[in-house]
């Protein structure tokens, strides 16, 4: 017999980023712009990598996978947030909230492991360049990406199952702009000890495991770079990692400030500011960081644009 959910709440109300009426339209325009840049940037990155044979390498395979993940991630959160800026009705059904929570967990956890996989790829490329194509074969890359999404899916099932067993019999106002674990736990009228423990244990394990992988990879990378005698060679080697390192620092910084603490100790403002960074801003910046600081991507983009112009009539 399945676990019975004693919830009497059939829908939730999202409070949004702010309740000030005069800010709704400016915020709608701002986040619509961010979402547009995110979608166009990530889909463009995927297209550039797919259409240019010179970019069919392990590094760009992971980058296109990250772009796909960021596109899905932003589409889970932003459309509902945008509708909340324009509509007076900010309600979301119980099932809709659980679905959004599930896919959010899949995306945010997968993002951590994708960044760790990309760090491993850079480690092999710089520390074992002669064996790079052998170690990071297409099969290995595909298995790594599949493992990334599998871990995200498994953890989302665990968190989602724990939230489903909670009772919601009081207020149905989620003081957030999307259905996140911490605000939902605060609404529950049943014991949330297990849920808070799982957030800390599983979330802590995911962040420690992935961040340690990244730190160890970059420790070996830095050691290898320092062994390069020429300054030009060191700069070239480090330039292949700088974009990824920037993305890692931004993502993990905002994520750790949100989840690696008891839910009761976080302020509403802090939660929303942290969430805006890792659910919207960073997803927009990722394709810009990787393209603007990568000569191969810039050259491939210019090549595609010149081809489009030459094929256009007139």
UniProtKB/Swiss-Prot annotation:
Membrane-protein topology: Multi-pass membrane protein
PANTHER family: OLFACTORY RECEPTOR
Main function: Odorant receptor.
Source species of the chain: Homo sapiens
Domain of life: Eukaryota
Gene: OR8D4
InterPro entries linked: GPCR_Rhodpsn, GPCR_Rhodpsn_7TM, Olfact_rcpt
Spans traversing the lipid bilayer: 26-46, 55-75, 100-120, 140-160, 198-217, 238-258, 272-292
Annotated CDD domains: 7tmA_OR8D-like
Assigned GO CC terms: plasma membrane
Similarity comment: family membership: Belongs to the G-protein coupled receptor 1 family.
Disulphide linkage map: 97-189
Main subcellular location of this protein, as a coarse class: membrane
A GO molecular-function annotation: G protein-coupled receptor activity
Keywords recorded for this protein, A-Z: Cell membrane, Disulfide bond, G-protein coupled receptor, Glycoprotein, Membrane, Olfaction, Receptor, Sensory transduction, Transducer, Transmembrane, Transmembrane helix
Location(s) in or outside the cell: Cell membrane
Residue intervals on the Cytoplasmic side: 47-54, 121-139, 218-237, 293-314
Extracellular side: 1-25, 76-99, 161-197, 259-271
Name of the molecule in the record: Olfactory receptor 8D4
Glycan-modified residues: 5
Gene Ontology terms: biological process: G protein-coupled receptor signaling pathway; sensory perception of smell
